[in-house]
Regions:
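Short amphipathic alpha-helical linker/capping segments at the junctions of internal repeats
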Residues: 43-57, 105-121
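N-proximal short alpha-helices
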Residues: 9, 37-40, 59-60, 73
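A cross-kingdom feature marking solvent-exposed beta-strand/loop segments within repeated
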Residues: 4-21, 46-49, 71-82
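A broadly conserved sequence feature marking short terminus-proximal activation segments
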Residues: 18-57
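Short cysteine-rich clusters marking metal-coordination/redox-active sites
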Residues: 3-6, 23-26, 64-67, 87
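Short, solvent-exposed interaction modules
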Residues: 50-96, 101
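Short metal-binding segments enriched for Cys and/or His
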Residues: 29-44, 91-107
Length: 121
């Protein structure tokens, strides 16, 4: 699967009960909503559907690396300008994260948790 930002092959990261695709160039992560919800729940956060946020239908996002549909931008915490992008077709989630090139699954999971803690405001 190619990164929707960089068009380079993303690497698969596998955890105990989670898998995701990560771009080593831009640190973007593509994750299934079920896997994302498992991360959120085990870290004391509500599931994605309960986090809130608002769809920004004006902004054109990248296309889904899974099914090539335009992703919808969801914005939260206006003060910090946080956002994620979601696919209305397959449900996949794209996250722009700041990670080292050699980040492991635990590091990625920690970055995801921090993003969504701040997303709630």
């Amino acid at each position: 699967m190619d990164c929707p930002r960089c068009n380079v092959e993303m690497e698969s990261l596998e955890g105990e009960d989670i898998s995701l695709q990560r771009c080593a160039e831009c640190s973007g992560v593509f994750i299934d909503p079920g896997d994302l919800n498992r991360i959120l729940l085990r870290n004391g956060l509500p599931v994605l559907e309960r986090l809130g946020g608002k769809a920004n239908l004006e902004e054109i996002a990248v296309t889904c690396p899974e099914c090539s549909v335009d992703l919808t931008v969801v914005e939260g915490n206006d003060k910090l300008g946080l956002r994620y992008e979601t696919c209305e077709s397959c449900g996949g989630i794209w996250l722009d994260l700041e990670l080292d090139e050699d980040a492991d699954m635990q590091t990625v999971e920690t970055a995801i948790v921090e993003l969504f803690r701040q997303f709630r405001g």
